[in-house]
Each structure stands twice: as C-alpha cells, then as structure tokens.
C-alpha cells in the first residue's frame, strides 16, 4: 500500500440533502462530480461527541483540526468547563481564588453568545456569579458575535446579560463587536477601539440595549458593533483584575497582548495591566495564570511522521494557518524535524465576499510544488467555504466553492501524476446552509456531516460510522507507518 499522501481539508463544506440556499449544491463543480463517480467516498460526523463537544454542538475549525491531526477524540474545553461549573470545581480554582483575593474590582471580558466556538454565555454568567458572590465589584464587557450565531441574535443575548447583571448587582460596562475585539490578523486599529473602550475612552450611551437596536437600524449587525460604554463606566484601573472567558485562544491573543505586554509597540497605550487570568492557554509567551491548563497530546500524526524521518508540508492561507500547524499538531507551536510550513497571506479585504476565491490558487500552487518536490505528507486547508460562508453572501459562497473545486482538480491531477494517495474531507460544514426556511441569513457552522474521499492503493470502500478522528490512522496506513495506540482506527 505504501504511498506518499496529500490530505486536503476543504473548510466549511458539508453535506446538506436540502439544495435550497446550499452554495455547495448550487456551484459548478466538475472536480467534485468526478470524485463522487470515481473515488471511494463516505460521510463523516464533525459535531457533538464525535469531536469531543456536547451533543448537538456544531463543530469548528479548532476542534476539527485537533481531531484530524491527533487521530482521537479530545474532550474540548467547552465540555471540561461545563463539567467544572456543574460540579462547583470552577469556583474553587486556585488561580481564580488568588485573583479575587488580590483585586477588589474584577472585569469579565468575552464573546457573549451560545455559539460554543469561542465561548459560551453560560460560562460568562457563571463567572459573573462567582465573582459577585465573592464580594468583588464586577464589570461585564460583552463582545457581540453575529458570526457563529445569527447576525442579529445579539439583541436577545444582550438583553439576557443586562437582566442578569441587574439581578446580580454587577455593572454592565461595555459592548463591542468581535470584528474589533477579536481580530487575529494584526489589524491593530480594530483592537485599539476595544482597548480604548475598556479604558473608558469610548462613545458613552445611557442604554447599551438601545444602542444595539440603533446599530441594527443603521444596518450594522452584531459582528461589527462599534465599541461603546455605559455612561456610568469610568474605565479600568491598573490594579484591577481581568478575566477572559473565551476558551478558544486564537481571537483573544491580540487583545491580551495589548492589555498586558510590555513589549507592544503597535500603538501608544495609556495603561498596561498585570492581573490577567485567561480561561485557557492563549499563548505560552504570555506567562499568565489560566483556569484550564492544556491537555498534553502525544503521538500526533505530525509527530509520528517526523519520528519516522519522513518529510511533511503544512500549508494554508493566513485565516487557517494556525489550524494546519498549531491545532493540527495537537496544540503545539514548535516546528517538528523535517516539517515545512508555508503561509500564504489572505487578501486584505474587509470581508471575504469581496474576494471569494481568497488566496486559494496560491495555496494550490504551494501544494503542487510540495508534490513535485516529493514531500512524503502534505496537509492543506482551503478556507473559502467557511470564511465566505460566514459573510452570509450566497452568490459569493457559490464562487468560493467553485474556486475550491478548481484547486481540487489541479491537486488531484498532480497527485495522480506523481503516484500520491489523497484524502479529501472537511473539518465542519457552513456554506451548504446559507439561509433558514424564513429567509434569515445563516453565517454560522452547521452540524451536517462532511464528505470524505480516499484514493489510495488497495482502498475500495470506507467503513461505516467513521469520524474525523479516523483520518490520522488512515494517513499512517497509506504511508506504511505504525499506528500508535492512542489513535482511533483507520477509515479502511
């Protein structure tokens, strides 16, 4: 069976039998049509317990890539935190108790929705409650979502938070869209807006809920809400404690850096804060206390390949680069021996419906170069289905799928020419459901299954009831390497 192998992850493309508002079905996709006819294929589960999330919870890129790269189901922080709240372990957390004892005033910051991708509203409320019951003066700083949930669902979430704060006697201090607070592409002007707001230097309003409704009236949805503060809020003090409740790291790193790093030079800051506590490890360089430490994941796909002395290439554009490196490698940043990483810059546009092809063709070129060079294993992510799906623009999402289809055709052709095996799958769905029955835009991920195609010597059928955690062993089987005991079985 021994062959070199390409693993292609088509982010945000799932299987939805309903063809209405389904960008995948609506797209012209000759490469996919050929794959369905000629290559063994099946469906994989990418949500709920199949990827270590609560039942019914949609999958996401972080979880999906961890599952694919580690070859096992890792119970995600979302599940771990839920359990810690249920059994009262969270309030006993040593790092939390230290912060509450040290700081009279405490600020809770995070994405407030039930999307479950970066955070959960229930975690936010649990933290407010713990801090308030401890006797601290507590300030809530809500980041509005509109991306992992409906674009105007914020009104209900923020109403819920406002009432919760009032009943608890805590301050509802600021509101800011994730476009500003959770940038991850070093667009520091956006993060600065959030920073200024936390310091009490933003536009002041008497009622945050009314401001949100006014934003909707001006066609500004949750993701893009401009930073605003309650008129009674006076800003953070340097001695205050700050707790970040997002459990996913990639979109909180920049804000933490702005608030805490002494080396930050991107813009002038009035204050730097030392008493920070994050829900999970956002970046090892921060040296900050955390509530939930990383679980150690050993014998990942990338590690096994590296230890065997084989070469590997990991490539994607900026938006998904962390997923094929850090997350795919089990939450480890460091480069492995014989591992090459190629980062293709994402286009500098406000939202990707402006350029649905994104940088797919450049990413495709990097893969073909890797095949021609003879890399033993290549993993690539095409971001289009997900990133354009998040915009809610149906026509742009169709173009996104068509761009991916073109790239698949080229890579498959190149793989066959050089006798490479290939596996094509997705980490989760998105663009296959762009509107609901009422015509509301759907910008979030789905819970639908995803396609998997396997072209390799001796493979004619894929087993039933498989998931993303069965892919790593499949790659090792193709490469003729021993499958570690920590991994789930192969797809074939």
From Swiss-Prot:
Pathway, per record: Carbohydrate degradation; glycolysis; pyruvate from D-glyceraldehyde 3-phosphate: step 3/5
Binding positions for substrate per the UniProt entry: 118, 147-148, 178, 184, 248-251, 320
GO molecular function, one term: phosphoglycerate mutase activity
GO cellular component, one term: cytosol
EC number annotated for this UniProt entry: 5.4.2.12
Annotated positions binding Mn(2+) 2: 11, 61, 427-428
Cofactor: Mn(2+)
Domain of life: Bacteria
Gene3D superfamilies: Alkaline Phosphatase, subunit A, BPG-independent phosphoglycerate mutase, domain B
Cofactor note: Binds 2 manganese ions per subunit.
Catalytic activity: (2R)-2-phosphoglycerate = (2R)-3-phosphoglycerate
Keywords, in A-Z order: Glycolysis, Isomerase, Manganese, Metal-binding
Pfam family name, one: iPGM_N
InterPro entries assigned: Alkaline_phosphatase_core_sf, BPG-indep_PGM_N, Metalloenzyme, PGAM_B_sf, Pgm_bpd_ind
Active-site residues from the entry: 61 (phosphoserine intermediate)
Residues binding Mn(2+) 1: 386, 390, 445
Family: Belongs to the BPG-independent phosphoglycerate mutase family.
HAMAP family: GpmI
Subunit structure: Monomer.
Function field: Catalyzes the interconversion of 2-phosphoglycerate and 3-phosphoglycerate.
PANTHER family on file: 2,3-BISPHOSPHOGLYCERATE-INDEPENDENT PHOSPHOGLYCERATE MUTASE
Record protein name field: 2,3-bisphosphoglycerate-independent phosphoglycerate mutase
């Amino acid at each position: 069976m021994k062959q070199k192998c390409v693993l292609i992850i088509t982010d945000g493309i799932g299987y939805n039998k309903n063809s209405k508002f389904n960008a995948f079905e609506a797209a012209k996709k000759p490469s996919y049509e050929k794959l369905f006819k000629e290559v063994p294929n099946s469906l994989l589960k990418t949500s709920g317990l199949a990827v270590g999330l609560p039942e019914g919870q949609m999958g996401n890129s972080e979880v999906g890539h961890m599952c694919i790269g580690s070859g096992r189901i890792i119970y995600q922080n979302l599940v771990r935190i839920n359990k810690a709240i249920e059994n009262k372990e969270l309030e006993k957390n040593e790092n939390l108790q230290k912060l509450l004892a040290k700081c009279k005033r405490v600020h809770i910051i995070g994405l407030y929705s039930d999307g479950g991708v970066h955070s959960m509203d229930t975690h936010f409320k649990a933290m407010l409650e713990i801090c308030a019951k401890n006797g601290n003066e507590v300030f809530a700083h809500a980041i509005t979502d509109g991306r992992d949930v409906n674009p105007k669902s914020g009104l209900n979430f923020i109403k819920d938070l406002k009432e919760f704060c009032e009943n608890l006697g805590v301050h509802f201090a600021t509101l800011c869209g994730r476009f500003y607070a959770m940038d991850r592409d070093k667009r520091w002007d956006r993060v600065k807006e959030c920073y200024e707001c936390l310091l009490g230097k933003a536009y002041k309003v008497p009622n945050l809920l009314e401001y949100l409704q006014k934003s909707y009236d001006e066609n500004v949805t949750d993701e893009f809400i401009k930073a605003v503060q309650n008129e009674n809020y006076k800003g953070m003090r340097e001695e205050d404690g700050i707790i970040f409740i997002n459990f996913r790291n990639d979109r909180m790193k920049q804000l933490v850096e702005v608030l805490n790093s002494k080396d930050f030079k991107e813009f002038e800051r009035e204050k730097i804060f030392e008493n920070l506590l994050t829900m999970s490890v956002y970046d090892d360089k921060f040296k900050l206390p955390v509530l939930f430490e990383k679980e150690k994941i050993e014998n990942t796909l990338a590690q096994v390949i590296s230890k065997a002395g084989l070469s590997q290439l990991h490539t994607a554009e900026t938006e998904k680069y962390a997923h094929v490196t850090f997350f795919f490698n089990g939450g480890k940043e460091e480069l492995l021996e014989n591992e090459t990483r190629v980062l293709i810059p994402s286009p500098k546009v406000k939202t990707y419906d402006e350029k649905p092809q994104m940088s797919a063709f450049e990413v495709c070129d990097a893969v073909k170069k890797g095949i021609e060079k003879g890399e033993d294993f290549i993993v690539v992510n095409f971001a289009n289905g997900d990133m354009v799906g998040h915009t809610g623009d149906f026509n742009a999402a169709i173009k996104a799928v068509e761009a991916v289809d073109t790239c698949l055709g080229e890579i498959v052709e190149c793989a066959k020419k050089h006798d490479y095996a290939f596996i094509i799958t997705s980490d989760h769905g998105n663009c296959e459901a762009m509107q609901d029955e009422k015509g509301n835009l759907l910008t979030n991920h789905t819970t639908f299954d995803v396609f998997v195609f396997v072209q390799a010597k001796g493979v004619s059928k894929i087993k039933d009831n498989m998931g993303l955690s069965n892919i790593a062993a499949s790659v090792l089987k193709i490469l003729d390497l021993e499958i570690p005991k920590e991994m789930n079985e192969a797809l074939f």
